[in-house]
């Protein structure tokens, strides 16, 4: 198992006031430049309005991450109830998660000790790492016998939510995108393992799907937790 990547060379000390000011000024500057307007002195009313807009963006992302985890949990429970009753799939489920090599923090208290850059990196690492599995999962689920349309619909919605959450993190923390992609490519298992998920043995196939749903539920909880921490810091309510 590969060691967890270190971000010590990229530390960013969290300062909510300074960080918010810089981001808001950048937003205003970009908007005015695009319109060909010289930047006026920004009054307090404009600052408050832009700060509220930024907070609203994070609140919406937190709501989306909550739905992302909730739907992942519902999908896992539906699959577990229909296919895994009386089976022992859960014994090895945790060990088989393809994101295990990243050693992302499981508990909130540990996640809260991380700065914003590291939290956003781990969020994007998890979301990117699920792009490939979700793509192939949707292809294979449509071929499963007696699988409810609700599960397929949930998987499609989860993929859509993941893309929206990725866009949110990318827009707020642009400089982390390249390091995150590099980190993921160094762990080839996150990209190559799911290129073929078709198995001749039905029990093995169900076991693999069970593991996927289990790991997705676990990782979506982490994503939800990280984004909510980022949101409460932006709102200064932590």
UniProtKB/Swiss-Prot annotation:
Signal peptide range in chain numbering:
1-36
The principal location of this protein is secreted
Q: What subcellular locations does the record give? A: Secreted
Where does this protein hold Zn(2+)? Answer: 66, 224
Entry-linked PANTHER family:
PROLACTIN, SOMATOTROPIN,PROLACTIN
Q: Which family does it belong to?
A: Belongs to the somatotropin/prolactin family.
What protein am I looking at? Chorionic somatomammotropin hormone 2
């Amino acid at each position: 198992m590969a060691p967890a990547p270190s971000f010590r060379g990229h530390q960013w000390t969290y300062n909510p006031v300074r960080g918010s000011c810089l981001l808001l000024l950048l937003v205003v500057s970009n908007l005015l430049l695009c319109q060909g307007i010289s930047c006026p002195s920004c009054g307090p009313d404009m600052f408050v309005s832009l700060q509220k807009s930024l907070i609203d963006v994070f609140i919406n992302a937190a709501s989306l991450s909550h739905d992302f985890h909730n739907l992942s949990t519902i999908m896992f429970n539906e699959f577990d109830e229909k296919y895994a009753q009386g089976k022992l799939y859960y014994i090895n489920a945790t060990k088989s998660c393809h994101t295990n090599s990243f050693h992302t923090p499981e508990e909130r208290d540990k996640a809260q000790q991380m700065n914003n850059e590291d939290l956003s990196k781990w969020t994007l690492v998890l979301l990117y790492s699920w792009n490939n599995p979700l793509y192939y999962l949707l292809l294979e689920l449509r071929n499963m016998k007696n699988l409810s349309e609700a599960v397929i619909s949930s998987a499609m919605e989860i993929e859509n939510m993941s893309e929206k959450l990725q866009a949110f993190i990318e827009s707020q923390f642009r400089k982390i995108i390249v390091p995150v992609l590099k980190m993921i490519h160094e762990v080839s298992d996150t990209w190559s393992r799911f290129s073929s998920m078709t198995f001749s043995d039905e029990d093995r196939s169900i076991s693999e799907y069970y593991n996927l749903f289990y790991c997705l539920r676990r990782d979506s909880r982490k994503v939800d937790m990280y984004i909510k921490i980022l949101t409460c810091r932006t709102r200064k309510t932590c």
